[in-house]
Amino acid sequence: MSELSTMAIKAGGQLAPDFMLWIGSKDVTPNLRERMVSLSLTDNRGFEADTLSITLDDSDGLLQLPQRGTVVSLFLGWVGQLHNKGDYTVDQVSHSGAPDVLTITARSVDFRGELNKARDVSYHDATLGSIVTQIAQRCGLILQMAEGFAGIKIDHIDQTHETDPSFVTRLAKRYGAAAIIKAGRLLFLRPGSGELASGKAIPTVLLTRQQGDKHNFMVADRTSYKGVQAKWLSTQEAKTHIFQMQRKAKAPNAAAVTHPDAKSPPKQAYDNEGEYTAGQKESLLVLPEVFDSKEAAKQAAEAKWSEIQRGVVHFTFQLATGRADLYPETPVQVSGFKTVIDASAWIISKVTHNLSVKDGFTTTLELEIDISDVEYEEIN
């Protein structure tokens, strides 16, 4: 068996990783601490459930298999600095060997009940807020919706043999939102805004390259566009109009701090850093659907444009010393990387915490470009 409290910290610190697990009102940590092989927690954005995976040493054969549906509460961090990471419902149990280990998988959302029921519902002359409110009430969830979504008018939309999670995800994607279930709440927020559903700004976190073990930065030009076009039909004129949204040209960024071992590229490589993640000049994405109003076309174009901008650049960063306090939508500023990386504002889109005897406590961040302060122009 293993003693988790003696794990070394890669960064050379003296802190010891720690965790606490509760089942109902019972603290089961003392029974599991010496059996802990590894613990992984993935904190997702969107309707994809957060996933907790626990692997325990069962070489003596004394562990009992937990019942599916059991609710587990996790606290994670360092000795004296634990963070409440929420409740998870056990939905998968596996036992393998030799050596014998028990692996328990639990998720933040229990999809076995009403959430997994396919429905046939028509919504007519409604608003986005009223529709999402109905869904939250059906699922027994408290709705928190970011400003700007509730009043959006929807003439008609059908939910045809579709589960509520699938339907609300479709709605969120269409109107540039993200639908998330956390702690009994349905959050309908604007991804990449750096704000909570309440509208409160999340403080920016500063991270340096020296805090990490690994990183990966990639620009995918095949998904890069100058703008998005959406067509809408004017019934009064019997004419199709085009609404186009594109990014305004941005002045080059000031030079950022670079890693001491990094080689300086030629000066011309920095000339257009302000447009480094922008699309090609003549590349436009045309939406195939013809919308029934200019407002609907605008909303669809804005949503698709935001989605594209967030997907152009991929940046992952593994922190050698785990940060249980970090969560999706947190704004991040980094330093010590290439200039174009340091000069960009980032938003956390996914967090994976790993705790093991072998590697200690690490946190891997998936980040995307923060587009909340990017300026756009409309072309009609």
Residue ranges and their predicted role:
Residues 1-113:
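Assembly/oligomerization scaffold segments
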Residues 2-8, 101-110, 147-222:
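Short beta-strand-centered interaction patches in the first periplasmic/extracellular domains
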Residues 81-82, 96-98, 180, 187, ...:
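Short glycine/serine/proline-enriched coil/turn segments at secondary-structure junctions
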Residues 35, 39-67, 211-380:
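An acidic/polar, Gly/Ser/Thr-rich interaction patch typically located in mid-to-C-terminal regions
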Residues 89-96, 121, 193, 345-357:
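Short, compositionally biased
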